[in-house]
Regions:
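Short acidic/His/Gly/Ser-rich catalytic and metal-binding motifs that mark active-site loops
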Residues: 39-45
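Catalytic core of soluble alpha/beta enzymes
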Residues: 1-6, 39
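Substrate-binding groove of N-acetylhexosamine-processing glycoside hydrolases
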Residues: 9-24, 28-31, 37, 48-242
Length: 242
């Protein structure tokens, strides 16, 4: 079981305690509340208890409760957007549907989620800026607050895959600039056999940082800035690609 039971009061008691502890621990009021890849939403025990309900309806119900808790605790939430986008067209969950901008939006989905909710568009795979721009445009149907999450590919390998990282990051951040997305962050992940150190991803962080100051970032600029900021050698990190 990897999906919380929507509607069960024990779930919201747990979430309240969880968020309250985070609120006490950190100074920031911005908290990422996740909700991604909940492919089993509305199935399993929920289906046994309540019968079939569309995922859009269930997601809306759950999100309203969690946002109410966040408001009480004076937390500013952001949420992964994949389940919201997938629920909005009703074509099914999964990454292929998340990134498919040809699916028509259900009429009832246009106002299903608060427009002031920050939705985090995550994409670690596409190579064309136009693809990112199209998906960002779809997000803006639902919210004025879009954040982009890219990645430094430190998983699925013995070391960080900088060839892939550079291939996806440059078009993604260029698309964000053209689309007016001002907030971005770089993810790293520990699943699927990651064996390297997080320190290996420093060059990826430098790449993201430099796009905050320039429309184009070439290797010469990145090499110089990386040495200045970290004391590390650009070529050594690029050579780690496996």
């Amino acid at each position: 079981a990897d999906v919380l039971l929507v509607g069960d009061e024990r779930v919201y008691e747990f979430i309240t305690h969880l968020l309250a502890e985070i609120r006490r621990t950190f100074r920031s009021r911005k908290i990422h509340i996740g909700m991604d890849e909940a492919f089993g939403l509305g199935r399993g025990a929920y289906l046994d208890l309540h019968g079939y309900h569309p995922q859009l309806e269930i997601m809306k119900q759950h999100l309203e409760r969690v946002l109410s808790i966040c408001k009480t605790l004076e937390i500013e939430p952001m949420v992964w957007s994949d389940m919201l986008i997938n629920a909005s067209h009703g074509k099914g969950t999964g990454m292929a549907n998340y990134y498919n901008t040809d699916h028509p939006i259900l009429p009832e989905a246009h106002d299903a989620f608060p427009r002031d909710l920050t939705q985090v568009f995550w994409d670690y795979n596409h190579h064309e800026a136009s693809t990112y721009e199209a998906i960002i445009a779809r997000h803006k149907i639902f919210t004025d607050r879009v954040v982009f999450a890219g990645a430094c590919w430190n998983w699925n390998s013995f070391t960080t895959d900088y060839d892939k990282t550079f291939l996806i990051t440059k078009p993604a951040l260029q698309a964000c600039k053209r689309s007016g997305v001002r907030d971005v962050f770089m993810t790293t992940w520990g699943d699927n056999g990651v064996e390297g150190s997080l320190l290996e991803t420093l060059l990826g962080a430098q790449l993201f940082a430099e796009y905050g100051y320039a429309d184009e970032v070439d290797d010469a600029r990145l090499r110089a800035r990386f040495l200045t900021c970290t004391g590390c050698n650009y070529d050594d990190f690029r050579a780690m690609t496996y």
